[in-house]
A protein has these predicted regions:
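Active-site neighborhoods and metal-handling regions in enzymes and metal-associated proteins
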Residues: 1-210
Length: 210
């Protein structure tokens, strides 16, 4: 799958991918930067893609997670919806003069509350076992452009929006990542055309299962 994506990007005339494509299924998706991409995909697995391309030397960094058999299980759906809620909320509130640290604190609270309500954790502090990276980083000429997390975001900065949850005990790793263009009072989702709603993913998988 990694090779197919990389080939497609180059075949479309784009520059080489800006970082090694991640195509992680099952428990491998609970490893943040898994890149071996050499395991067999089991029927009930989710597969997590973290991938990108370059355009005029600027990087894109996108993640999507979907069920390889086309249907989310009940538990997969529960965890996915928690991550999706965080992703949507960060997109909704991100704007100039906020800091990445502020976005991270909001993201952690949403994920912790969701997991607590779903009985996936017993205390909000446990969220650190299942979410252990930043919700955002600066994107530009490099996939991770240098940026201080306490620095107010300027207008026209581009940042990632990538909440995730990783449960090794269930073999479930989910990350949903978009690229946001920061404006004065809002953010523009540059990757909004890439589907991420459960109903859209399942519909797409059903339509293309052959």
């Amino acid at each position: 799958l990694e090779a197919f994506f990389d080939y497609t990007i180059k075949d479309e005339g784009n520059n080489p991918v800006p970082f090694k494509t991640i195509a992680a299924s099952g428990i491998n998706a609970t490893t943040l930067h898994y890149s071996s991409n050499n395991s067999l995909i089991n029927d009930n697995d989710l597969i997590l893609f973290d991938l990108g391309c370059k355009y005029d030397n600027y990087c894109a960094d996108i993640s999507r997670t979907f069920p390889i058999n086309g249907k989310f299980s009940k538990l997969q759906k529960t965890i996915y919806e928690i991550v999706l809620k965080a992703n949507k909320q960060i997109c909704k509130i991100a704007k100039a003069n906020m800091t990445i640290r502020q976005l991270q604190e909001i993201c952690i609270d949403i994920l912790a509350t969701g997991c607590l309500n779903a009985s996936l954790i017993k205390d909000k502090k446990e969220i650190s076992k299942y979410y252990f990276h930043s919700v955002s980083h600066s994107i530009g000429l490099d996939t991770h452009d240098p940026f201080i997390k306490d620095t107010p975001l300027p207008v026209n900065a581009v940042i990632s929006n990538e909440p995730g949850l990783y449960f090794k005990e269930y073999g479930i790793g989910i990350r949903i990542e978009d690229d946001l263009l920061i404006k004065e009072n809002h953010a523009i989702n540059l990757s909004s055309k890439i589907i991420k709603e459960i109903k859209d993913i399942e519909k797409f998988m059903e339509r293309n299962k052959d």
